[in-house]
Amino acid sequence: ISFGGLRAVNAFDIEIEKGQLYGLIGPNGAGKTTIFNLLTGVYKPDEGIIKLDGENITGKKAIDINKAGIARTFQNIRLFKDMSVKDNVKVGLHNHHPYSTLEGILRLPRYFKVEKEMDERAMELLKVFDLDQEADLLASNLPYGKQRKLEIARALATDPKLLLLDEPAAGMNPNETKELMDTIRFVRDKFDMTILLIEHDMKLVSGICEKLTVLNF
């Protein structure tokens, strides 16, 4: 992909095996986050093919790519900070627990059924991350490390096949980073998740990633 004649990512080619914890490293400006934006439909590639489980998802809309099975977190936390912890997770559940606008406005039986299912699933995910006791708090009131966990929980709520983590340890102290490493391993094992990780913390990368690709200018 190019921006104004500047080639941002060129001849990038990786294959990630199911259940693998894969690291993507390189200096700032090498194109790591741009690759995430290509994989998730924020940008459309000028050339090349992106496949998920053999399905060509190149150029699809972000929402369709998410429905196909790719979810992500962001380098800068992007929670809905004026919503509760539980409601943040429920946002991620709407793709798989839909009800129509009319059902929501008129509060028809399906609306209450789906909302109950989403409440239960959201609490299950929050419990996995030890966030169930904070379910009714505003997301903005969580400590930084727990906000990172909440962002991962919200991504998992979309039921992805591939989870993209963009610098999840950014801004964390050593204790929080160690806890995050344990969390990422746990997520991979519990959910049989395939994970692609961007990170500058080499201790974290070398501690959990099974394979690495290095980007350079």
Regions found by a protein language model. Give the residues of each.
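Glycine-rich phosphate-binding loops of nucleotide-dependent enzymes
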Residues: 1-217
